Amino acid sequence: MNTSHKTLKTIAILGQPNVGKSSLFNRLARERIAITSDFAGTTRDINKRKIALNGHEVELLDTGGMAKDALLSKEIKALNLKAAQMSDLILYVVDGKSIPSDEDLKLFREVFKINPNCFLVINKIDNDKEKERAYAFSSFGMPKSFNISVSHNRGISALIDAVLSALDLNQIIEQDLDADILESLETPNNALEEEIIQVGIIGRVNVGKSSLLNALTKKERSLVSSVAGTTIDPIDETILIGDQKICFVDTAGIRHRGKILGIEKYALERTQKALEKSHIALLVLDVSAPFVELDEKISSLADKHSLGIILVLNKWDIRYAPYEEIIATLKRKFRFLEYAPVITTSCLKARHIDEIKHKIIEVYECFSKRIPTSLLNSVINQATQKHPLPSDGGKLVKVYYATQFATKPPQISLIMNRPKALHFSYKRYLINTLRKEFNFLGTPLILNAKDKKSAQQN
């Protein structure tokens, strides 16, 4: 466990399903990060987030519910106990509206034995009359417990104060204040802007996204099972390759729209939001069986969010057909992603995992690329001379100049006399020419045509 205040303190929220762990997590994080609902066992993976409690930065873990009869309960329990062992403080949450069960008491004692730095948090004590119900939890043997109501925001401030006191954080900010101020004054603002590559892992249910996340991070952060749809919340993990940080987001598996039920609807919305923040998508395809229509639909998410993309062919050790046949099918079905690099892997055997990491950095460099204006115009001029622009009803169509106005992804404006006359086929020709000249591997290239007036306004 962490002992130095220079190391980020870790708080784990544990307890049985549907007692309010994710709601407490969201309340402390002041953001709806974990999905909450009336379904027991909504959280299946460990959500992790750096948050600030009264100005003190800590790391908060929200774990899956440890129900005895729950599917995957052994795997979830093992992950939770591991989180408990690694944490500086545990918030064990119980439902104050329910009678304490023998199973709950047994689980609490097991957690307490692993890590005695533990608070008993009795949730759903919505008013003073309901405080009497909390006495039923005296059998847990804790000298002090915390009666709270996350939904009514009762008792949260007192809990936060106790957490900071238990972690010895109240004194730290006073001791380090002067040094922190001096350090911030000496540090240029641009040095504080740390560039982290955000990578979203997308794919159908049970294609191996969580296994890929675990292989990339070398941690069992994401629960892996043959049960389809094990991951519900998008969860993230950051690794370091050289001096480059990469944050992976393992998103919920996507089903056919007609099969999306209950909590998975929320999970799909969270996946969309996670991709909005991503730079690159790892599209995981299961090659133990032929590709399906849903694979193609999911691949369009990368295009929708203008992400860099890498195609990851998982379960290669049990592929359904020879290499040549699979690649030929891939090129036919995913023709619009012909610029995307393809990597074969077996996550369970850690095949080509390092190659994926380095390819992410390579694609990100292309995704962030800026072409010098003179060089860009030279290539565009050569392309238009080699294949002149088609006329517009007999009238000359002309490109005055080109300029790149954005990166991530690269966006280029063609300033023209008749921008509406630029045919999509000629636009595709120019994009392919730029790809060939400047190597935009795995990167969408956005080309817009504008007239001089609109270009000057922008």
Curated annotation (Swiss-Prot):
KH-like domain residues: 369-453
Superkingdom, taxonomy of origin: Bacteria
Sites binding GTP 2 sit at 203-210, 250-254, 314-317
The record's section on PROSITE patterns has: G_ENGA
Which residue range or ranges hold the EngA-type G domain? 9-171, 197-368
Q: Which GO terms describe its molecular function?
A: GTP binding; ribosome binding
Sorted UniProt keywords: GTP-binding, Nucleotide-binding, Repeat, Ribosome biogenesis
Which processes are annotated in GO (biological process)? ribosome biogenesis
Give the InterPro entries listed for this entry. Answer: G_ENGA, GTP-bd, GTPase_Der, KH_dom-like, KH_dom-like_a/b, P-loop_NTPase, Small_GTP-bd
In this chain, GTP 1 is annotated as bound at 15-22, 62-66, 123-126
Coiled-coil residues are: none
State how it assembles.
Answer: Associates with the 50S ribosomal subunit.
Protein family = Belongs to the TRAFAC class TrmE-Era-EngA-EngB-Septin-like GTPase superfamily. EngA (Der) GTPase family.
Tell me the NCBIfam families matching this sequence: GTPase_EngA, small_GTP
Write out the function statement from the record: GTPase that plays an essential role in the late steps of ribosome biogenesis.
What is the name of the protein in this document? GTPase Der
Species of the source? Helicobacter pylori (strain ATCC 700392 / 26695) (Campylobacter pylori)
Q: What is the lineage of its organism?
A: Bacteria, Pseudomonadati, Campylobacterota, Epsilonproteobacteria, Campylobacterales
